A protein has these predicted regions:
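Short, polar/charged alpha-helical segment
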Residues: 1-11, 121
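Pocket-flanking alpha-helical
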Residues: 19-55, 142, 162-167
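Solvent-exposed loop/turn segments at secondary-structure junctions
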Residues: 21-23, 41-45, 76-79, 112-116, ...
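Ligand-binding pocket segment of bilobal, Venus flytrap-like solute-binding proteins
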Residues: 33-37, 106-183
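A conserved helix-loop-strand patch within extracytoplasmic ligand-binding domains
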Residues: 56-109
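A bilobed periplasmic-binding-protein/Venus flytrap-type ligand-binding module shared by bacterial periplasmic
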Residues: 68-80, 202-216, 239-240
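C-terminal lobe and pocket-closing loops
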Residues: 163-223, 227-228
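C-terminal functional modules
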Residues: 200, 213, 221-273
Length: 273
């Protein structure tokens, strides 16, 4: 909403497309969608790099924010599970995260995005099963309920995100990611399988646009190049809606008032309203 508002202030019309992460690439290539403000390394880099290779989209910069997407738990879980955040501890304590007293395997909640979690579970022999939820709102609803009940929960989370500033928690400390972990089975502790590591701990968050944006809307293109989000900015934007319950319009208003100095620096004098 913030970026949309800034574009509207340039005198342009804005339409918000509710589109899946998978479908966004074809839409960007065809010009059905014109910009994506946040491309996250762990969940989107494969498709993103493939699209760049064939010049189907244009990359126009990297945010200052450092991203991470991985297994996460609220801090209070450590009271019941010694050894956290070390990944080996979650096997010892897998029963704490179980919904089935028979097999005792823990449940890992995630969305429809492909992080290779099934591969990680196999490669590290984790005593967990995966429950996929339809969207991030469903993940946060389950998290909020667990926190209210102080119940152990393991789920996909990312930073920057609303939990950074509203709920204390930690990422599981898996073996450190390298590119070899995804391609060379001999790398790492499991010599037979790839993905015996976590996701990148210091991932990039990039901006990408339709290749025709610069020619058709040069001022929007320049604005997109100038926009630079910090971790705090992204976390606060998310928290205003998810944790504080503001509408997206009200959250955008509060956010823009808080970061008005940054916004001023993003505007191009020749394009300013």
């Amino acid at each position: 909403k913030v970026v949309g508002t800034l574009i509207q202030q340039l005198g342009e019309k804005v339409e918000y497309q509710n589109i899946s992460a998978e479908d966004q690439w074809g839409a960007l290539r065809k010009g059905l969608v014109h910009l994506q403000v946040e491309v996250w390394q762990a969940s989107m880099s494969k498709d993103f790099n493939k699209m760049l290779k064939y010049n189907y989209i244009e990359e126009i910069g990297t945010h200052s924010a450092i991203g991470r997407e991985d297994w996460w738990y609220p801090d209070y879980v450590e009271q019941s599970c010694n050894g956290l955040p070390n990944w080996q501890a979650i096997n010892t304590c897998s029963h704490l995260f179980s919904e089935d007293s028979i097999n005792g395997k823990g449940v890992y909640y995630t969305g429809l995005w492909d992080f290779g979690d099934a591969d990680i579970i196999r490669a590290l022999n984790l005593q967990f099963t995966i429950t996929r939820l339809s969207d991030d709102k469903s993940i946060w609803d389950i998290l909020k309920t667990a926190v209210r009940e102080k119940r152990p929960i393991m789920l996909l989370n990312w930073t920057p995100n609303w939990t950074d500033v509203r709920i204390k928690g930690k990422f599981v400390d898996f073996p450190t990611y390298t590119s070899e972990c995804e391609s060379d089975p001999s790398w790492g502790i499991n010599k037979d399988l790839v993905k015996d590591c976590g996701n990148p701990k210091n991932g990039w968050i990039k901006k990408t646009v339709w290749t025709g944006l610069k020619d058709q809307w040069p001022c929007v293109y320049q604005l997109m190049k100038n926009i630079d989000f910090s971790n705090e900015m992204i976390a606060e934007a998310s928290a205003l809606v998810i944790a504080d319950g503001h509408s997206e319009d009200k959250a955008a208003e509060i956010w823009m008032n808080k970061y008005h100095k940054n916004i001023s620096s993003w505007r191009n004098s020749s394009c300013s309203p």
